[in-house]
Amino acid sequence: MPKTKLILTEPDVAPLIGSNNIQKRNSDGSAAESHPSWNPHPIQGWTTDFIPLVLQEAIDEKYYDELIPVSGDDGIFWSTELAKKEGIITGVSGGSTFAIAIKVAKKAKPGSNILCMIPDTAERYMSSILFDSIDSEMNNEEIDLYKSV
């Protein structure tokens, strides 16, 4: 599809692809060791400490158009914004994906279509940094709203 663009993203503090550092491999293609550019990051489910062979093959074949790194803070921000404004409950990875979709949308031509897949919910992250700013008890305004519906 000549008009379709594939955008990759990865945590800005763990730039496995963006660093251009080589993933050392065993003779069977599996990772021989952790990638030298891997660092801990808050985007759960993203960027293990190695580049899988299937991803490396796609990178080598240039099956993507652009790589845009994302910060964990941006992922947390957009995850909470999606919950507050759209009722979409997702984890930091979903917020990070959406953060990049917003960046792409801001520079896209008018009339462009952008697909952003957010494949999980936030229920598994209730005790994570994602919900640090949310009180566990309802305030009076929330109680009144609850009683009104």
Residue ranges of predicted features:
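Active-site/ligand-binding loops adjacent to catalytic centers
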Residues: 1-92, 129-149
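Buried hydrophobic packing segments
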Residues: 79, 97-105
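Short glycine-rich anion-binding loops that position phosphate/pyrophosphate groups of nucleotides
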Residues: 95, 120-122
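Surface-exposed, flexible loop/turn segments at secondary-structure boundaries
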Residues: 14, 122-123
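Ser/Thr-glycine-rich phosphate-binding loops at phosphate-binding pockets of nucleotides
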Residues: 93-97, 114
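Catalytic phosphate/nucleotide-handling subdomain of diverse soluble enzymes
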Residues: 102-119, 126-138, 145-147
